[in-house]
């Protein structure tokens, strides 16, 4: 339960009663002007009291899990571990929200309201209270098997079959099998490895290949058509009515976001494990990624959610840990982590606007990283000092840029990815008896950032000029 008490003398409640002088009254959006009276002026509709808001959220859920395990060792050489199970998840969520007008906190919590506050809300289409229910169901069946020969060679396999009511109606879309197969070779378990010890304390080589999946963003729920109630705008409260609108078109084939991943790595230790190094290389192929699909508008809206994209990525991760000093009362350890990633959108079945690509948050375009930033080419100043740019037609222009252009995007200049390509951390832990000090830094680079758009066509005397103005025409 969340309660919000907006008391009588609070700034928010006072704003509903501020109607002087005339300039303030005419620009105060919290006052009410009766549309039924052509000569009306804005009036106060919350003369006394404050506002009380309450938000109730309840959830009833249960989880049922059944598992079985089998472990055995044959002739002290063959180690077998088997694990199987099933899981059922259910969650029902209920939400209610309410706003009460005119609650007099200084008068014994007595409500006093003007009927016009409800008339104002009805004409604006705002809600007085809301109720909402969501239902989530998920079933999963899984199996895992591991075989190891004397701890030297290990093979592991996992299979999972999962279904959820969030995705499409067809069995192919709603249910998905995923799997993982991996293997490891512990070279330090070999008899000949003792010759390399303790300089090389341990060495393991590992590899895996898998198909994994994700249900996608929690906001995507259009495996069935999404229809919401709403109050259409009418010029007066007497003409008001309720209605239904299509929020999102049905996509019965909406399915999981999937990923194939190949991982190869090595785990090694040196100097009696005082130095440990882990190196992993991976290659990923993401497909059936969920995004907006541009439709012909036949269903009433031009966009719906669907599996529209594919992405390829690869990278390397390095982790180095050292025990620099180790005594009875004092120790000093260092950890260094570095990772590099490269990704590229290989398929994108949706349309993109110029505005999306030049926005500072980055956007997706086929053939480029997932969050790429583009720029409109700057062509210098013209003879009267105005900045000029290259437009979508290949012409140099000051005002001819069509930010809604979807077809001709080749004139844009690729600036880079807004996501870092290299990142990691460097930390040191000092421990003396019962005291511990952790000193660490994180770092990232390889990305670009759109500069703050501080330049405007109009400035008042109240505007503070930023330092970027000093070199405003330098490129």
Name each model-derived stretch:
Residues 15-16, 469:
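Solvent-exposed, well-ordered loop and adjacent helix/strand elements within mature globular domains
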Residues 97, 221, 306, 325-418, ...:
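Conserved small-residue
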Residues 144, 267, 378, 387, ...:
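Short, surface-exposed charged micro-motifs
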